[in-house]
Amino acid sequence: MKLHADARGSYNLITAYGAGYVAVNGQRHNASLIVMPDRVLPWSVAAFDELAPESFELVKSEKPEIVLLGTGPKQRFPDPGLTASLREARIGLEVMDLQAACRTYNILVAEERRVAAALLFA
């Protein structure tokens, strides 16, 4: 079978993940980060319990269609007040564990959606 290069090859994809790391295009990251199709940004929030309303300002400024919040090894839902600014900006939010967020991010990038994955390891 003849394979062709994918035109989406220039987008950031999550190529691996595990306990305490995520690899984006093969580059390993060991701290919280925000992954978007065109950039990867460090995220100052180290753990779920550190989330505050201002934690989402960086991702909100990028104006994604949807934010995937990866909450570490298990799914944990933030208080609605913490994410109110996303709702007010009409940015969707999906909360899931880190592994599900990584998989979902890649699917949405393949669909050429404006997605941001805000990924926490703890």
Go through the PLM ranges and name each one.
Residues 1-53, 110-122:
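Non-catalytic interface/targeting segments
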Residues 51-61:
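A short, acidic, amphipathic alpha-helical segment used as a generic capping/interface helix at domain edges
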Residues 42-44, 75-78, 104:
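Short active-site-adjacent helix-start/loop capping segments
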Residues 59-95:
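Mid-chain, well-packed structural core segment of small domains
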Residues 88, 92-120:
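C-terminal structural segments of small proteins and small subunits
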Residues 50, 76-77, 99:
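Residue-level recognition of alpha-helix initiation/capping sites
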